[in-house]
Amino acid sequence: MLRNTLKCAQLSSKYGFKTTTRTFMTTQPQLNVTDAPPVLFTVQDTARVITLNRPKKLNALNAEMSESMFKTLNEYAKSDTTNLVILKSSNRPRSFCAGGDVATVAIFNFNKEFAKSIKFFTDEYSLNFQIATYLKPIVTFMDGITMGGGVGLSIHTPFRIATENTKWAMPEMDIGFFPDVGSTFALPRIVTLANSNSQMALYLCLTGEVVTGADAYMLGLASHYVSSENLDALQKRLGEISPPFNNDPQSAYFFGMVNESIDEFVSPLPKDYVFKYSNEKLNVIEACFNLSKNGTIEDIMNNLRQYEGSAEGKAFAQEIKTKLLTKSPSSLQIALRLVQENSRDHIESAIKRDLYTAANMCMNQDSLVEFSEATKHKLIDKQRVPYPWTKKEQLFVSQLTSITSPKPSLPMSLLRNTSNVTWTQYPYHSKYQLPTEQEIAAYIEKRTNDDTGAKVTEREVLNHFANVIPSRRGKLGIQSLCKIVCERKCEEVNDGLRWK
């Protein structure tokens, strides 16, 4: 606490703003009220706190929750007294948000109430797009299960806080759906390792792999790692900061202040922590899920089947292939198509494509998918065995296009938010998370020139990313990540590094 108080004074001096460490105003949600609304909106000085409050459903999002958050965020965007937004759960550390309430959607579909299903996804995806283009800082506490719709609430925010309780996944392949909520836009851009052609992004989308908070941080799925017990103090701290220049919470300068405030509460990774993916496993993912070389799921399966490498690599490839065989064949193909399209599109178009896909899968006019049936099997009937897929044929390109495209007979659009912008790259994500392999490659290649003999050492790479870039100076785990990249992707030539 003394360390944090001293840092507050340092930040006050650096940025020229005042902090209030004793007299902050806050309203706390009454979580013991049984009829409390599913989303709570409270005040923490100049911050606004949105608390998901549907614990019995692990905060699974329904239309009411998405709609209320969307409307309130629009009001916060216009408010002169709101500097930033904190998004968290009343159910932590068990869950942040376990996903969208697709069980209810499946019931709508069986009852032919497709308008209700489409409204559900319109509300949810409009919220995702709003968060992705929000002009004030949003800080998300991913303390607990963060899956599906929970990923949609967090992945688009520049400040994504993982904890020791985080369990991150996109498990939609198990219910015959697809990795939605803009995840196929986000993951190709922010994942740090084995992702030069969206390989790790595609792997996570197709396998539904669950990763811990520490792994989520190392992979770039989270921007910071903070112990769960420090989140309340962090919330108070965030409510104390205000932008110094023209009181503009949309300025890049204020985003930097938010980042430095979060950095004060960052926790070390667990002492026994070992990154989930060894170099051999990263090599498998990189080789077998390359978007530029794989046009179909069958290509990926063949790559896994024929993988040549170490014994560890071959075993991992076989493990992945076995896992993929339990997933919905049609969903795998749709997911691949969406990663291909959304990895090169802008955020608004990508989330609209998710909306078209969700609506078409709900209506299922051509009987190409098994979303409703598989969702009922797993989430309503609570069957523990995988759903017995019957739609196993390879879809034609025209069928995939039809599923992921709008229908003239079914007009739909995202709700209009206050930002009225879109972009192909997030403006702040790369500044505050660990660097990607592509960033490290660009630096090494820029510093290396065989004609002039210019070279760069591993030590210089580590120093550049850990000390030279202000927003990443001393960042947790940055040296470990750079070492992984240098060891796996570089070769030593004349006492320097060359990118392979």
Curated annotation (Swiss-Prot):
InterPro entries for the chain: ClpP/crotonase-like_dom_sf, ECH_dom, Enoyl-CoA_hyd/isom_CS, HIBYL-CoA-H
PTM annotation (Phosphothreonine): residues: 326
SUPFAM superfamilies xref list: ClpP/crotonase
Subcellular localization: Mitochondrion
CC annotations in GO: mitochondrial inner membrane; mitochondrial small ribosomal subunit; mitochondrion
Keywords associated with the record: Branched-chain amino acid catabolism, Hydrolase, Mitochondrion, Phosphoprotein, Ribonucleoprotein, Ribosomal protein
Binding site for substrate: 124, 149, 172, 180
Catalytic activity reported: 3-hydroxy-2-methylpropanoyl-CoA + H2O = 3-hydroxy-2-methylpropanoate + CoA + H(+)
Superkingdom field: Eukaryota
Assembly mode: Component of the mitochondrial small ribosomal subunit (mt-SSU). Mature yeast 74S mitochondrial ribosomes consist of a small (37S) and a large (54S) subunit. The 37S small subunit contains a 15S ribosomal RNA (15S mt-rRNA) and 34 different proteins. The 54S large subunit contains a 21S rRNA (21S mt-rRNA) and 46 different proteins. mS47 forms a protuberance of the yeast mitoribosome and retains a solvent-exposed cavity likely capable of accommodating a substrate, in accordance with it being an active enzyme as well as an integral constituent of the mitoribosome.
Misc note: Present with 3950 molecules/cell in log phase SD medium.
Family note: Belongs to the enoyl-CoA hydratase/isomerase family. Mitochondrion-specific ribosomal protein mS47 subfamily.
Protein name: Small ribosomal subunit protein mS47
Species of provenance: Saccharomyces cerevisiae (strain ATCC 204508 / S288c) (Baker's yeast)
